[in-house]
């Protein structure tokens, strides 16, 4: 029977049961070489190492941090909502213009983090310009941002923009103002 028998898959194709020698062609009178007949040591294949680029690993780490940051922002949002419910309504009188408290500034910042994932110095400076007439609101804004910078884990701060990392290591703004007030009044 020839190796090019007719089969069901196609008349011109060789039969799948026919085994073809690999490598060299077989010649008449020559014995087909098996792995046991080969002389010399077996050829070794080089083991291919899986290489992950530093850029890829960095991207994966950033993605993991972004997921953790989103989780932290959700937790902060829940906490801020709870704090807002606990805030007493007597603090704001009817005749007084509505001012932002520390909690309200934190709620605003957390919402901005959730939506745009960034808190920048330019946004902070704009908010300071709006609250400039009221010393108390300005202080509340600075305190809220400082608290937020210290609530978010340090390794994730770089993903939030340039505002929170710059506030992380600094002291509490109220303490700085009190120290400045004492030095100017003396």
Swiss-Prot record:
Region annotation (Disordered) ranges: 1-45
Pfam families hit by this protein: Paramyxo_NS_C
Record carries keyword Mitochondrion: no
Keywords: Host cytoplasmic vesicle, Host nucleus
Polar residues: bias regions: 1-12
Subcellular location: Host nucleus; Host cytoplasmic vesicle
InterPro entries found in the cross-reference section: Paramyxovir_NSC (IPR003875)
A GO CC term attached to the entry: host cell nucleus
Family: Belongs to the morbillivirus protein C family.
Binding partners and assembly: Interacts with the phosphoprotein (via C-terminus); this interaction allows C to associate with the ribonucleocapsid.
The protein's role, per its UniProt record: Ribonucleocapsid-associated protein that interacts with the phosphoprotein (P), thereby increasing replication accuracy and processivity of the polymerase complex.
UniProt protein name: Protein C
Phylogenetic lineage: Viruses, Riboviria, Orthornavirae, Negarnaviricota, Haploviricotina
């Amino acid at each position: 029977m020839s190796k090019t028998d007719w089969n069901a898959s196609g008349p011109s194709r060789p039969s799948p049961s026919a085994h073809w020698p690999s490598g060299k062609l077989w010649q008449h009178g020559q014995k087909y070489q098996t792995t046991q007949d080969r002389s010399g040591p077996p050829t070794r294949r080089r083991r291919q190492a899986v290489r992950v680029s530093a850029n890829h690993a960095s991207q994966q780490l950033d993605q993991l941090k972004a997921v953790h940051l989103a989780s932290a922002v959700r937790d902060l949002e829940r906490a801020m909502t709870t704090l807002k419910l606990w805030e007493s309504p007597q603090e704001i009188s009817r005749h007084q213009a509505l001012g932002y408290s520390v909690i309200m500034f934190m709620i605003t910042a957390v919402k901005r983090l959730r939506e745009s994932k960034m808190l920048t110095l330019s946004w902070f400076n704009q908010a300071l310009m709006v609250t400039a007439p009221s010393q108390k609101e300005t202080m509340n804004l600075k305190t809220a941002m400082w608290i937020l910078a210290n609530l978010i884990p340090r390794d994730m701060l770089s993903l939030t923009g340039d505002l929170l990392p710059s506030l992380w290591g600094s002291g509490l703004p109220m303490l700085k103002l009190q120290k400045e007030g004492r030095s100017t009044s003396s």
